[in-house]
Amino acid sequence: MNPVLAQSSQPRGRSLWQDARARLLRNRAAVTAIALLSLISLLVIAAPWLSPHEFDAIDWDNISTPPSLANGHWFGTDAVGRDLFVRTLYGGRMSLMVGIIATGVSLLIGIAWGATAGYLGGRIDGIMMRIVDILYAMPFMFFVILLMVFFGRNIYLIFIAIGAINWLDMARIVRGQTLTLKNREFIEAAIACGVSTPRIILRHIVPNLAGVVAVYVTLTIPQVILVESFLSFLGLGVQEPDTSWGALVNEGAQDMESAPWSLLFPASFLATTLFCFNFIGDGLRDALDPRDR
């Protein structure tokens, strides 16, 4: 038999990421969630071109009017006559931006802290993780509320404050993964070649945490959005004229009896987005689980 033909007839193996992608695409719930989340993301990005109304413009002839195609207010208007469709999309842009940026902040802190503690080990690991335990015991939501009260409702402060309270779980997860990775052969080979500790962490430890990080991101973004929504519901979140889904839900709850649409549409977008992220996170976790390969 021709050796070339024999070699070409052998089945090709799939990498971890190829196998994970194939399994993720077989997960109908995750695929549907990805499609819905992509649609919502496109809508919030294209908000200025989807409606003739500005998000802060007041239509004095249509105050608290129900949804209608005739007057161009597809989701109706709020209590002061602003178009609810465009405000819902602008609110989604703000909520998603808070979720992504704050998650990025927590990701950077958590990976740096957890990878350093896990790789160095010993007394340094003990001290760093005791600090994490102490921070776990602190009422961080109360801390964030105090920051909002004393320094004002600055949107950048919201990014940093929410991100700074969500890195603790990531630090523990990364530390656990690093403890298993640092005894692998490729790490020992890097040490034998004289590679510095920071380079080992950045070039060999962190890239091998990509699967864990991907799952963490999809599960943390909805948590951050919920925190921001809770702060906005308390009146401590985004300032007018800007808005977010949490702020719109707060406004809609006040007019729920007279104008139920002002609560229905923002709450529906918020709930759908949260469910999408959770389904995607569950799908990624199942796809990357080596026990199911």
Language model segments and positions:
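Short, membrane-interfacial amphipathic segments enriched in basic
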Residues: 2-20, 70-83, 120, 198-202, ...
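Short secondary-structure capping/turn micro-motifs that flank functional sites
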Residues: 40-41, 59, 206-207
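Residue-level signature of catalytic and energy-coupling elements of molecular machines
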Residues: 24, 42, 134
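Residue-level signal for helical boundary/lining positions with a hydrophobic bias
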Residues: 23, 50, 74-77, 255, ...
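Short, strongly hydrophobic transmembrane alpha-helices
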Residues: 29-48, 111, 271
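Alpha-helical transmembrane segments of integral membrane proteins
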Residues: 79-293
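Hydrophobic alpha-helical transmembrane segments of membrane transport/permease proteins
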Residues: 2, 35, 43-79, 234-242
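Transmembrane alpha-helical segments of polytopic membrane transport and secretion proteins
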Residues: 1-38, 280-293
